[in-house]
């Protein structure tokens, strides 16, 4: 049974967040039996009044601890002043009359190993700025004004979703090099995202983490926005403002592993608690991190409660679940591993957790998106439970790898890799995909996106523009990491702001103009965003011209015309630096056509090649009833639509 405490409105949610549950046997038992999906309403630090006395109630799970006390600003960090009482099921609790919101605290745990360690609150709502690690008593108090957005949010399967991936610590910085406050970021980011035409932002580096170089993927504060950019209310302001501007918010969430930092979750009660005890299951050698024990109800509820904290309390619209493949397989990146009860390599406990997570989220936070970064061919990632994992979307890692491999090839040899750009069509209808070019593709000597392209600076930009146009006209939602929308030439550096000064240069501004135009077309045209998983959503016209490296395909709105469907457009890509005059491309209808977009336009940094004749010839071609004779600029993509009659000259 799910926790009956469920918010029906932001006002109700605010009330729920301010009223902790009684710390009694019944509620503790619900947590242990996985029936309490918001354990943060029970554990952690909560200002309360007991017997007319104001104070803070502290509670923590440490079943094998020998002794636990709460220390902080309210008692001079003296471990003898406020010992905690051992409660049922391995929980500890204490009421501290002298404690107040804004004060720092930790749990001083004498563990099963006899060592005494000061631990951060696993459910802490706010934390000191790194390198300090104390938790801070902090009840969230924010007046939301995004009701209109919250009432209509949806996973948006047949809506345009174009995501701008942003590392909150390095998108922009103050003149002194320090981080922007969330409120400063809110206005600057909303203005830019609106200008560029994205529908959503995906924020990484939001959850509290001790090491900047982890980019936020080694989390110690699963319930706390990082204090680098301000207080929890400041983060709430960021989300609220983006919603008021019509922009959705997704955050990266990391339930696959956690860091070994002594102050964090590691060996919390002097022995493995949140992590598997067997290092063959519980330790990532590649990442030097621990793996959550998904078989423990208390751990499962800790993670599910964290997800709901962001989706309910902070009004976030979706979670991008990191490193799902590492959770699904017991032999992931390891030579020594423990088979499951059936002798297989699948982590059955992690699979059960992911299914439960998605079921709870879709029940408790309807309209939110759950997105899996899953890099294998695990079946049914976006299929409903119980047979699938229940995610809404999955990153198209296969599309990304194949497409980047192709575009990194010298055009002379691309004909030998022609299939790399058509193979996605074989499996694209099997899942709900997001075509993601993320931060992972522009670090660790992989080069920035434009720098991956072969040739001189002009051809690199031409090739990158063609890549972007093919990405935006291929079925699937879109995600592009910050800086790549203006062809940043260097790899991402998390310690520095983006090089915004280059956007004043025409060659970078041109790529920026193209991304803006692509977002506009994508949002305006249903043929480009409806029917991603329909066979009829993309029809190949020319998929076999390997010698010329030319591709042509139709994007179609597969809905019946009575429901507003039937719109279509034609994309033609010439992916060599060779001008092709009068190239024949089959089309399904006669009459006039017009160019919606050419990546060779001068506005985008190209030469502005013209199309003198866009009247379809009656001779069939490529299995179609008619054909066009097109002038294909070098390293370019054209997007055309059928207009039926001769367009006016100003439309050409």
UniProtKB/Swiss-Prot annotation:
Keywords: Carbohydrate metabolism, Glycogen biosynthesis, Glycogen metabolism, Glycosyltransferase, Transferase
GO molecular function, one term: 1,4-alpha-glucan branching enzyme activity
Pathway: Glycan biosynthesis; glycogen biosynthesis
Catalytic activity: Transfers a segment of a (1->4)-alpha-D-glucan chain to a primary hydroxy group in a similar glucan chain
Enzyme active site: 322, 373
Enzyme Commission code: 2.4.1.18
GO-annotated biological processes: glycogen biosynthetic process
Database matches in InterPro entries: A-amylase/branching_C, Branching_enzy, GlgB, GlgB_N_E_set_prok, Glyco_hydro_13_cat_dom, Glyco_hydro_13_N, Glyco_hydro_b, Glycoside_hydrolase_SF
Any one of the GO CC terms: cytosol
Domain of life from the UniProt record: Bacteria
HAMAP family: GlgB
Primary role: Catalyzes the formation of the alpha-1,6-glucosidic linkages in glycogen by scission of a 1,4-alpha-linked oligosaccharide from growing alpha-1,4-glucan chains and the subsequent attachment of the oligosaccharide to the alpha-1,6 position.
Known partners and oligomeric status: Monomer.
Family listed: Belongs to the glycosyl hydrolase 13 family. GlgB subfamily.
Name recorded for this polypeptide: 1,4-alpha-glucan branching enzyme GlgB
Organism of derivation: Deinococcus geothermalis (strain DSM 11300 / CIP 105573 / AG-3a)
Organism classification: Bacteria, Thermotogati, Deinococcota, Deinococci, Deinococcales
Gene from which the chain derives: glgB
